[in-house]
Amino acid sequence: TGVVYSAETLTRMADILTQKSKAFGHNIFLVSDEPYRDIAFDGKTVPYPAAFYPHTLTCFSYSKSLSLPGERLGYVAVRPGCEGEDILVDMMSQISRFTGHNCPPSIIQRAVSRCQKVTSDLSVYQTNMELLYEKLTALGFEVERPGGTFYIFPKALEEDANAFCQKAREFDLLLVPSDS
């Protein structure tokens, strides 16, 4: 939905996870999937969930911030001091091998390693978001204005999202319904 969680929200979430971890007798891991981290609008800063909760795994992909669609190049970071840190790192390495995940070409890895402090011109995403947001709201769609990413999630114009998506097919539009 493009929501950027505030530090206050992440603090509350960390408190809940800590309480529930104690109640269950083991730590609950938070997996923070952050491929769109660098695409934030209106000067927003995206806080790092790992700064709020010690048992966090952070997933990141360079394909969004460097505008490299289709490139599967990124990382999973385990917060230092996370319970089972060594086991988690070893397990992720094994999963990568067992699933047949191949490393990107060396030249791509080398190029990305030199781009750690840069991004593509991400302002185009905000321009596109604003245009789409304005057009959708002008057409009567209920739309939450995203704080980041390049997705907009409008509410269907009729109650049954499946029926709405079927109607859209008549206009050669393929939509995915969601009633959540």
Regions found by a protein language model. Give the residues of each.
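PLP-dependent class I/II
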Residues: 1-180
